[in-house]
Regions:
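Extended amphipathic alpha-helical segments with heptad-repeat/coiled-coil character used for oligomerization
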Residues: 330, 343-358
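Extended, regular secondary-structure scaffolds
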Residues: 81-195
Length: 358
């Protein structure tokens, strides 16, 4: 029987609610949407730059972590995952929340049963490896299954792992002899409380502002239409126009005396509002909704500020650069501990943030 989707292939369903699944899809869609404002992209990029402005790390394992990609994907989808890979040397694969199925979590929100998929093409066939990671009695068991189809949009039929050279050396099932403290992945999650369904799953940094950003996008689209209409019209006396020679989408003729009309550019008040000024105002609105430190996104200042000044304790705000840095430090420490548990070198997380100018 042909298998159509990942949940059918794994024989399990994600443990998140429908509201959470829909919200997560909306976060990624809004981030990658080619809209005028690109507010989600702006928010994430400003935060990532602020967090890692003068980031420094010692040790090969720590420096190998793609820190910006990991945090960026966590800010978009609420959480991302680091998977250690050893191919002669240790490196890390960053997995977005949209690239992993979570079938079960513990009381702290940490996954205890997940599914990963990897696709390869050989000739006209598409091979999809389904990797399931389950914690049972404190030990991690990894199961591998391979599917082959003629379309990348479905899994197709199950085949032996040896059918694809890229996966031929993998075991069908393997259980680690000692605990890895989880599913063998490092979870990097945003520090905000889940505002979608109250569960332990991480939420996007801009999740509380999704409706506001939708309204702002609609408002900007309307202003852009009015701007184009206003910019493209010249009011002139009708006797100055020669029929059939000028486009009436540019000129508007009035039946008044030429001395009273002349040539007048239609310039509504909205043209006096620059796009940059509106965008800064929008970012300040978003700041207030998602609880960012005031001025972190939308304030234009003449004097530079240090990271310490931006993340000072004044004001009651939920998310600051310091909180995001603590989240990354925790994930980095867990990443090093995971490599050591897998038999790799033991390193200490030595991270420097500097006192950078933002």
């Amino acid at each position: 029987m042909d298998i159509l989707n990942l949940e059918q292939g794994f024989g399990a369903a994600e443990c998140c609610s429908q509201a959470m699944a829909a919200a997560r899809q909306a976060w990624f869609d809004s981030y990658y949407a080619a809209s005028v404002l690109r507010l989600p992209y702006t928010i994430v990029r400003k935060l990532v730059r602020g967090v890692f402005a003068e980031y420094g790390a010692s040790g090969e394992l720590l420096r190998a972590i793609p820190e910006r990609a990991a945090l960026e994907l966590a800010l978009i989808g609420g959480e991302s995952y680091l998977k250690p890979v050893f191919d002669g040397e240790w490196h890390w694969r960053v997995i977005p929340r949209s690239g992993i199925l979570v079938f079960a979590r513990d009381h702290a929100g940490e996954p205890t049963d997940v599914g990963l998929a990897e696709m390869r093409q050989e000739g006209r066939h598409f091979y999809t490896l389904l990797e399931r990671r389950q914690v049972q009695n404190g030990l991690l068991t990894v199961s591998n299954r391979l599917f082959r189809s003629l379309s990348e949009n479905e899994l197709g039929r199950e085949v032996p792992l040896s059918a694809c050279a890229a996966f031929a050396g993998l075991p069908e099932r393997f259980t680690y002899s000692k605990s890895l403290g989880g599913v063998g992945l490092v979870r990097l999650a945003t520090p905000m409380t889940n505002c979608i369904d109250g569960s332990g799953e991480g939420v996007s940094v801009f999740a509380p502002a999704m409706e506001l950003m939708r309204v702002l996008e609609e408002n900007e689209a309307q202003l852009e239409t009015e701007f184009r209409n206003g910019m493209s019209r010249l009011v002139v006396s009708r006797d100055m126009l020669r029929g059939g020679q000028l486009k009436d989408e540019l000129f508007v003729a009035l039946d008044e005396s030429p001395e009273n009309v002349g040539i007048t550019v239609f310039s509504p008040e909205l043209r006096q509002k620059s796009f940059i000024e509106r965008q800064q105002a929008y970012l300040r609105l978003v700041e207030n909704v998602i609880g960012l430190k005031r001025g972190l996104l939308g304030e234009v200042e003449a004097a530079p500020r240090t990271a310490t000044e931006i993340t000072s304790s004044e004001g009651e705000f939920l998310t600051t650069l310091l909180e995001l840095r603590r989240c990354f430090e925790t994930a980095a420490e867990r990443a090093l501990a995971l490599v050591a548990a897998l038999g790799g070198p033991a390193e200490r997380a030595d991270i420097s943030w500097g006192d950078n100018i933002i």
